[in-house]
Regions:
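A compositional/biophysical signature of low hydrophobicity enriched in polar/charged and small residues
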Residues: 1-168
């Protein structure tokens, strides 16, 4: 089935789920003014089309991740892809993107302390071939986060097991 651009109903459903990912189809249907079946079908399509993911959003500080950093990376152009891919799998990293301007890559990462950030900079990044410059900015106090779910896998890159994910 071809991709269908989200319409106003889809946007309303998405907006509700952004506020409460555990809202039931019935609750959403009542708020949007459509049937429960319509909500179910729309959510399934949005997920299938990779427009929507339903995830748990964590609070980094509550997980002991008190140091957040935005790191600008400049590198040898022939190695930018390899650099980005190496950084993307490092513990603590939640976002890696190519950029224009003064840096080639932007990284968002969370660590328990400044010492772990320093270790990341001096050991992890220093070991990646092709990095020419890394400029780190520590986030002193977040005002607003538009990245729900960004702290997924910052504690460990190991995926949760079924036993670990099942409430006791």
């Amino acid at each position: 089935m071809p991709f269908q651009k989200p319409d106003a109903v889809d946007q309303h459903i998405i907006s509700i789920l952004e506020q409460n990912g555990r809202a039931t189809n019935r609750e959403i249907a009542e708020a949007v003014g459509v049937s429960e079946g319509t909500v179910r079908n729309r959510i399934e399509r949005l997920i299938r089309d990779d427009v929507l993911r339903i995830v748990g959003v964590t609070n980094p500080a509550k997980l002991g991740l008190n140091t957040a950093a935005v790191i600008s990376i400049s590198g040898e152009l022939s190695r930018i892809t390899d650099i980005a891919e190496s950084i993307a799998v490092a513990d603590g990293v939640v976002y890696v993107g190519y950029t224009t301007g003064n840096a080639d890559i932007i990284v968002l990462a969370f660590f328990p302390t400044n010492d772990e950030l320093t270790e990341f900079m001096t050991q992890t990044l220093a070991a990646i071939p092709g990095i020419v410059k890394a400029e780190t900015n520590i986030i002193l106090k977040p005002v607003r986060s538009l990245f729900p779910g960004t702290t997924m896998n910052v504690v460990s890159r190991q995926p949760p097991t079924l036993a670990a994910a099942t409430p006791s």
